[in-house]
Structures are given as C-alpha cells and as structure tokens.
Amino acid sequence: MSNSPNPWIDMRPGIRRKTITTGATMYQMVAELKAGSHLPEHHHEQEQISHVLSGRLVMITGGARHEVAAGESFYLASNVPHAVDTIEDAVVLDTFSPPRTDYLAVDAAAKSA
C-alpha cells in the first residue's frame, strides 16, 4: 500500500500499520485491518483523524457503534476511549497530533533489528 521506507508493524492479529511521515506536530500512518479483526478499547493523548480508504469498520466510542465506510472519516479528541471492529478488509489513513512517539520508537527498533 505505502511506498514509505518504514517497516510494516504488526499491531494485533489481522492489524498492521506503517508510518508514512511525521513532523513537529503531526504524525501520519496507514493501517491495514483484516475482516473480523478487533482493536480493543484504548485511548491516547493525541487527537486522531482517520479516513477509510477502502473497506468498512465499526468505531466504538462511549458504548455507541458507528459504521464507517470507504470515503468517510472520523475524529477522536484526546484521551477518548475507542475500539474498532472490522467488518470487511479495510485500509485506513490515520493522522495524529501530536506525533505518536510510541509508534516512532517501535519503528526505530524494527529498522535497527
């Protein structure tokens, strides 16, 4: 999917991500999610905008389920708990602010391995 020199990182079974670029205040990645995969509830300090490039998934926030399909986007404020259920294979472009330094550290370790 991405021509980025960064490695693909397996996040969970059926979910992997790849850093596209980062800057002083923003970070962008692409995620591939297989149908039936699940990202458990979590939260992070970063604001997040996700744009579904292909496929369909369900974003779960505050107990509510929101289906999001190719061509649609969603916004998550800082520290909002959320989870994801993947309905069909999906590719998602995620942008975070500030950058995901935790993801960048994993990228650096993978490159040096």
Label every PLM stretch briefly.
Residues 38-39, 55-60, 74:
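Short beta-strand segments in beta-sandwich/barrel cores
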Residues 29-43:
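Conserved short histidine dyad/triad with adjacent acidic residue
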Residues 1-25, 105-113:
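A short, N-terminal "cap"/entry segment at the start of jelly-roll beta-barrel domains
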Residues 63-78:
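Short acidic-glycine-tyrosine-enriched beta hairpin
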Residues 78-102:
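Ligand-binding loop in jelly-roll beta-barrel domains
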Residues 46-57, 62:
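Glycine- and acidic-residue-biased ligand/ion/polar-headgroup-sensing regions
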Residues 53-54, 69-70, 88:
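A cytosolic small-molecule/anion-sensing beta-strand core signal
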Residues 56-58, 65, 81, 91:
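Structural motif
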